[in-house]
């Protein structure tokens, strides 16, 4: 509960007077509220022996609540999970079956969020309205994507994905199904490939928080539970699979990505036996059920993204990394009421894109975006840094620092990638391919005492920085 004006239907105290009452429940037919422990036990199913038993129940046990205003005999009804309803309860269900019953998310509510629906994020309607405002389905050919990559600054759908180099192996090619036809990869087949016990983070859409599941649990939820029987809306957006044998060649990125991935370019430059592991961000499988929503965010380090829809559909709203938009984004991240604010209404110059099965989508560096899933979807995508976007990437990393993004959600080994990039630039002819502003920002970044990088071809970080500064002077005199 967050509102200070709502009073308990039974004790009449509002939430500023509730003396630590742990749980509120909301009527599914009006805006009535009450403390769980205030519900008279004669109105509770299953039948309880004394009121103190209500203290043992938590928000997860609440199935539904109807206040006294919706019963001719002024009876309320609180149903708790795992209950077999009796004759009177069945009659209640029949009388009200045509009502617009909207299941309440009691877990989100008692974690400090306002009253909301279990199967719809509170920003969904605002997102859809904003989507119509900015809808602009721009496309580009694969050949143009490759030839013009350095100057592309807007999100674009690739009109001919089959010619882009993008490839995702099929279930029949993996021998998972006996068919000569193309059978798309799905959650069921993914579970067979990676194993029932493979761990993954599953996001609860309402709270935007992750839970630890196994693939078998996710498969049961996604593949074998009907939408009406799913307890909550969930999605998986952080399953990286580049290390999986079946996907090393079984997933291939677009040529434009392979040609411009900064880690690919610099990682093996001057490599030593003691080098740390290459960042694993190149191949993700993303799985969402219908009505899933991911609120506005920046991909770590402002990375560019490729996004291939294997099945289902997606809706994106994206905003460019202008100074104005990034300022609003920082303010929103720092706002204690962040979850109650739809950021899309505050940003400028948006682009909205709807993606369907087979589509390939490219998101440039630094775009602030939110994603809605109209139907169950299975996606293959990945992130990559570029030489083109050095300054914007460094700006986003600074925003991550300012907004205290946990290290787990930042680009892995980013410091090493930037250090290797500097050494690669100084030992090649590629220094001319970036601006003096980019070099100045690299110098500023590496000069921070918080950045720990041990150069491969220089005695110290200080010597590396000195060489970079000398390059800036040469730029200024040419």
Swiss-Prot record:
Zn finger limits (PHD-type): 6-70
Predominant localisation class: nucleus
InterPro entries tied to this protein: JHDM1_Histone_Demethylase (IPR050690), JmjC_dom (IPR003347), Znf_FYVE_PHD (IPR011011), Znf_PHD (IPR001965), Znf_RING/FYVE/PHD (IPR013083)
GO terms for MF: histone H3K36me/H3K36me2 demethylase activity; zinc ion binding
GO cellular component labels: nucleus
Cofactor(s) for this UniProt protein: Fe(2+)
SMART domains assigned: JmjC, PHD
Cofactor note: Binds 1 Fe(2+) ion per subunit.
Residues binding Fe cation: 297, 299, 369
Keyword Nucleus: yes
JmjC domain residues: 242-401
Keyword Translocase on entry: no
Top-level EC class as recorded in UniProt: oxidoreductase
Residues engaged in binding substrate: 294, 314
PROSITE patterns the record matches: JMJC
Domain notes: The JmjC domain mediates the demethylation activity.
Annotated family: Belongs to the JHDM1 histone demethylase family.
Protein name stated in the entry: JmjC domain-containing histone demethylation protein 1
Organism in which the protein naturally occurs: Kluyveromyces lactis (strain ATCC 8585 / CBS 2359 / DSM 70799 / NBRC 1267 / NRRL Y-1140 / WM37)
Primary gene name: JHD1
């Amino acid at each position: 509960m967050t509102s200070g004006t709502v009073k308990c239907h039974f004790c009449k105290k509002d939430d500023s007077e509730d003396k630590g009452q742990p749980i509120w429940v909301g009527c599914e037919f009006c805006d009535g509220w009450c403390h769980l422990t205030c519900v008279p036990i004669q109105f509770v199913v299953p039948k309880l022996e004394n009121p103190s038993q209500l203290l043992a129940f938590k928000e997860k046990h609440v199935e539904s609540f109807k206040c006294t205003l919706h019963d001719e005999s002024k009876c309320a009804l609180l149903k708790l999970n795992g209950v077999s309803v009796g004759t009177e309860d069945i009659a209640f269900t029949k009388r009200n079956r045509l009502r617009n019953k909207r299941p309440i998310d009691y877990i989100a509510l008692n974690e400090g969020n306002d009253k909301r629906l279990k199967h719809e994020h509170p920003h969904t309607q605002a997102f859809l309205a904003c989507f119509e405002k900015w809808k602009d389905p721009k496309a580009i050919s694969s050949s143009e994507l490759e030839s013009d990559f350095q100057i592309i600054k807007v999100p674009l759908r690739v009109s001919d994905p089959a010619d882009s180099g993008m490839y995702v192996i099929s279930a029949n090619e993996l021998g998972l199904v006996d068919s000569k036809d193309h059978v798309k990869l799905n959650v069921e087949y993914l579970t067979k490939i990676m194993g029932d016990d493979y761990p993954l983070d599953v996001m609860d859409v309402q709270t935007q928080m992750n839970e630890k599941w196994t693939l078998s649990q996710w498969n049961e939820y996604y593949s074998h539970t009907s939408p009406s029987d799913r307890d909550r809306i969930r999605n998986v957006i952080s399953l990286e699979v580049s290390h999986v044998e079946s996907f090393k060649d079984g997933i291939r990125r677009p040529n434009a990505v392979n040609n411009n991935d900064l880690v690919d370019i610099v990682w093996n430059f001057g490599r030593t036996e003691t080098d740390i592991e290459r960042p694993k961000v190149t191949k993700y499988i993303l799985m969402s059920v219908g009505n899933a929503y991911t609120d506005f965010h920046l991909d770590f380090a402002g990375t560019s993204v490729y996004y291939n829809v294997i099945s289902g559909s997606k809706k994106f709203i994206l905003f460019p990394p202008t100074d104005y938009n990034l300022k609003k984004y920082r303010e929103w991240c720092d706002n204690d009421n962040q979850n109650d604010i739809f950021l899309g209404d505050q940003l400028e110059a948006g682009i909205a894109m709807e993606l369907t099965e087979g589509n390939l989508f490219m998101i440039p560096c630094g775009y602030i975006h939110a994603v809605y899933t109209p139907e169950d979807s299975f996606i293959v995508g990945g992130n990559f840094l570029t030489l083109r976007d050095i300054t914007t990437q460094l700006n986003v990393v600074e925003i991550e620092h300012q907004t205290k993004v946990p290290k787990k959600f930042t680009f892995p080994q980013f410091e090493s990638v930037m250090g290797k990039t500097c050494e690669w630039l100084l030992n090649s002819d590629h220094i001319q391919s970036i601006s003096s502003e980019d070099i100045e920002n690299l110098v500023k970044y590496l000069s921070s005492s918080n950045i720990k990088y041990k150069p491969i071809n220089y005695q110290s970080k200080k010597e590396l920085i000195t060489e970079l500064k000398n390059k800036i002077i040469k730029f200024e005199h040419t």
